[in-house]
């Protein structure tokens, strides 16, 4: 409490405001992240995953903008900037991939493996 008595009262609101601003700035990137994810998994064991570069080419040819494609264990995780791109990619992938693949959508799917993986294409 000695520190608070040494600080002039007129500076106290500015210091508290600055501290709140620092907290807000540190949490802003997490709150503003609207990245969506589509995950492609194999339905039957023994079937290899599709080639990430092939998927990138096919989605790009259909006008879908991909942020990155990342392997995640037994799945490929495709990151998109917004929900519209994700929905368009799901439609294309369901037409493009044969029956043995599962296309699942979600916000930040497979978050636990995201840091351990490297981006293949971005």
From Swiss-Prot:
Regions crossing the membrane: 11-31
- List the keywords (alphabetical): Cell inner membrane, Cell membrane, Membrane, Transmembrane, Transmembrane helix
Q: Which residues lie on this side of the membrane: Periplasmic?
A: 32-122
Q: Topology: which residues are Cytoplasmic?
A: 1-10
Its localization reads: Cell inner membrane
One GO cellular component term = plasma membrane
Q: Does the keyword Cell inner membrane apply?
A: yes
UniProt cross-references to InterPro entries, sorted A to Z: Modulator_MzrA, SecD-TM
Molecular function per GO? protein kinase binding
Principal localisation: membrane
Could you name the domain of life of the organism this protein comes from?
Bacteria
**Record's bilayer topology term:** Single-pass membrane protein
KW DNA damage (keyword) present: no
The protein's role, per its UniProt record: Modulates the activity of the EnvZ/OmpR two-component regulatory system, probably by directly modulating EnvZ enzymatic activity and increasing stability of phosphorylated OmpR.
Q: How would you summarize the oligomeric state and partners of this protein?
A: Interacts with EnvZ.
The family annotation for this protein states: Belongs to the MzrA family.
Q: What is this protein called?
A: Modulator protein MzrA
Q: Which organism is it from?
A: Pantoea sp. (strain At-9b)
Gene name of the encoded protein: mzrA
